[in-house]
């Protein structure tokens, strides 16, 4: 038996042209609009942080290029997901130096660096979010205001994801041997 990742070696190359775009104080919700993704939490955040731009990607009809341009301009990709199998959108974001802000649950527990995970209970429900709203907004402010300091960690996150979760290298080696 060979433990391998999901073969996505092509993704880094396909996003290269979006990597060095000027960053804006933009936070994205790149998930589908579904109850388990908790878009209501994300939609409430602009009331606390009016100086930042928040975009729910599925609220627009975006081409792949338009979506990737948003990723390239954004400083944060936000998740409050209650269901996640692999999480490709946060990997796409990290590939273009966008900070992934993810709960410490689901696949994120194993895949995410501690610096990008927040306590699971902060977004366990909308009610829980209301109790932890200040902590979440402070984390977002820190990521936005200190963005450049996080770039080395984003790249470390990309290396971990690329090598351990989004590579078919072990599978290919197993087939060849």
Report residues per predicted region.
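Donor nucleotide-sugar binding/catalytic pocket of nucleotide-sugar-dependent glycosyltransferases
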Residues: 1-16
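Conserved donor-binding/catalytic core segment of Leloir-type glycosyltransferases
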Residues: 18-37, 43-47
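Short alpha-helical donor nucleotide-sugar binding micro-motif in glycosyltransferases
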Residues: 68-74
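A short hydrophobic beta-strand element within the catalytic core of glycosyltransferases
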Residues: 77-78
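Aromatic "clamp/platform" in nucleotide-sugar-dependent glycosyltransferases that forms part
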Residues: 81-82
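A charged, aromatic-enriched C-terminal amphipathic alpha-helix characteristic of glycosyltransferases
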Residues: 123-176
């Amino acid at each position: 038996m060979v433990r391998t990742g999901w073969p996505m070696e092509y993704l880094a190359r396909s996003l290269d042209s979006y990597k060095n775009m000027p960053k804006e104080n933009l936070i994205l919700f790149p998930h589908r609009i579904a109850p388990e993704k908790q878009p209501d939490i994300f939609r409430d955040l602009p009331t606390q942080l009016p100086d930042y731009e928040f975009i729910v990607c599925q609220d627009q009809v975006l081409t792949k290029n338009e979506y990737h341009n948003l990723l390239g301009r954004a400083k944060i990709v936000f998740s409050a997901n209650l269901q996640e199998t692999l999480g490709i959108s946060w990997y796409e974001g990290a590939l273009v130096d966008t900070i992934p802000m993810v709960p410490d649950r689901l696949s994120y527990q194993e895949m995410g660096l501690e610096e990008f995970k927040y306590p699971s209970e902060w977004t366990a429900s909308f009610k829980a979010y209301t109790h932890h709203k200040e902590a979440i907004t402070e984390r977002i402010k820190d990521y936005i205001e200190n963005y450049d300091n996080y770039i080395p960690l984003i790249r470390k996150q990309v290396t971990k994801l690329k090598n351990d979760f989004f590579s078919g290298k072990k599978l290919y080696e197993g087939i060849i041997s």
